[in-house]
Amino acid sequence: MKNLERLFAEKLLKIKAIKLQPANPFTWASGWKSPFYCDNRKTLSYPSLRNFVKIEITRLILERFGQVDAIAGVATGAIPQGALVADALNLPFVYVRSTPKDHGLENLIEGELRPGMKVVVVEDLISTGGSSLKAVEAIRRDGCEVIGMVAAYTYGFPVAEEAFKNAKVPLVTLTNYEAVLDVALRTGYIEEEDIATLNDWRKDPAHWDAGK
């Protein structure tokens, strides 16, 4: 496990951006029941942590993707960090809506991209990957090349891994499910007996039953 993954997991747990409640699960917007909730947007309220995320995403982009022409943030969670990263790299920035706005030019992509541009997408969190990959499709329809995506966190669901593989989008993240559980267990945030419940949920989150 990489040092960055552990370090960022520690920071997220410290500010309570991640909540683990196997006995009292959350309900996601999708309707899924989940013992795990991650709100990366809380990092924006902590200047040193906000800067850490910007620096590390910027570093990953430079290391993994080389020549980049523009940064795209996925609305709404990744707009702030995407803009900060674009500023650090001195690159154009756009953001991609989940649906076109219902007035004006009805844009899906806000900002300006030119055909042929190499774009890296910034995302705050990967669950199923559906909304993230819709943003990729929108950028590709504009004639640009999406050379990769960097996200703050991924649950690592099999459905998401398969979706990114099929879409041919390399994905890099600051931290992930395994790192969070490792840190949470070592620091007493969760108990050993919670691990089986959390792992059962991650295998099939759509059908997970908290009572089993």
Swiss-Prot record:
SUPFAM superfamilies the UniProt entry points to: PRTase-like
Positions annotated to bind orotate: 127
Keyword line: Glycosyltransferase, Magnesium, Pyrimidine biosynthesis, Transferase
One Pfam family linked to the record: Pribosyltran
UniProt organism field: Bacteroides thetaiotaomicron (strain ATCC 29148 / DSM 2079 / JCM 5827 / CCUG 10774 / NCTC 10582 / VPI-5482 / E50)
Transmembrane segments: none
Function in brief: Catalyzes the transfer of a ribosyl phosphate group from 5-phosphoribose 1-diphosphate to orotate, leading to the formation of orotidine monophosphate (OMP).
EC number, as in UniProt: 2.4.2.10
Binding annotation for 5-phospho-alpha-D-ribose 1-diphosphate: 97, 101, 103, 123-131
First-level EC class: transferase
Catalytic reactions of this protein: orotidine 5'-phosphate + diphosphate = orotate + 5-phospho-alpha-D-ribose 1-diphosphate
GO molecular function annotation: magnesium ion binding; orotate phosphoribosyltransferase activity
Subunit record text: Homodimer.
NCBIfam families: pyrE
Required co-factors: Mg(2+)
GO terms of biological process kind: 'de novo' UMP biosynthetic process; pyrimidine nucleobase biosynthetic process; UMP biosynthetic process
Family affiliation: Belongs to the purine/pyrimidine phosphoribosyltransferase family. PyrE subfamily.
Name assigned to this protein: Orotate phosphoribosyltransferase
Pathway(s) of this molecule: Pyrimidine metabolism; UMP biosynthesis via de novo pathway; UMP from orotate: step 1/2
Highest rank taxon of the organism: Bacteria
PANTHER family documented for this protein: OROTATE PHOSPHORIBOSYLTRANSFERASE, URIDINE 5'-MONOPHOSPHATE SYNTHASE
